[in-house]
Amino acid sequence: MKYADRYGNRWEETGLQDRFLEKLYKSVPGRAVVKVLVHPWVSRMGGWILSQKASCWLIPLFLKGHPMDESGWVKQRFTSYNDFFMRKLKPGQRPVEEDTARIISPCDAKLTVCPITEYGIMKIKHTPYTVKELLKSEKLARAYEGGYGFVYRLTVDDYHRYIYTETGKKSGNYKIPGIFHTVNPIANDLEPIYKENTREFCLIRTTDAGTVLQMEVGALMVGKIEKDQEEAFVHRGEEKGRFAFGGSTIVVLYQRGQVQPDQDLLDNSRDGYETKVTQGEAVGDKVGKCRK
């Protein structure tokens, strides 16, 4: 995997999970196993198991491999592995950028910024997708031609609660049923995961950034995506939902002429590097708005 930070550093790392997925997706026996694993019932079963009290023994094993500062958590005792995975942080642990002329990240993640062509095509890690395939709506897809797609990939070590990126009137949620591939880039090289995986999105009609589309993409072993369902007026930085165990992705689409991504994010994405960002961090400017 190729990663970058906001300080100009770039590096590559391959973890145990990456090596396992590479063998799984790139071998004949592995592909046969994948065909079973991606079915929704497998993720539902996994989610149920990890929501049981008996799963708590997995927590210290996870922390051994992924050391964390526990002082920022609201609680230190958990009723299940999923309860731990969806843990809440204390106020102030993820400050939201105060300058509303800047756009923000909805979550802790590895970010790829994808320009959307005038034909509605965006490349995610060198794999071309059309916005129409992503949304299953040609009419809605046309509204984002020439804009930008921000693809936030969460891994198991990320904070799995996420927020609204903008203030505005939110639509109801639209669900697109599908299967549950892992969102690891290794799978994306071989499978069109962002047009096959289960996903849900809403529209946020804002006064200064057009109509923003915010989508949650389910993934292998994500038992559920917990979120609100109703139409409402929402506020930037307000909690929108949380993912149960597993890697997941949030996709945010902006219309043409509404935002300008930060240059380091564009450069990293062009060169195939995902940039590590945190929830509430500024990732670009609203066009025509002056920074404070």
Segments the model singles out, each with a brief description of its role:
Residues 1-292:
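Contiguous, well-folded functional domains in the mature portion of proteins
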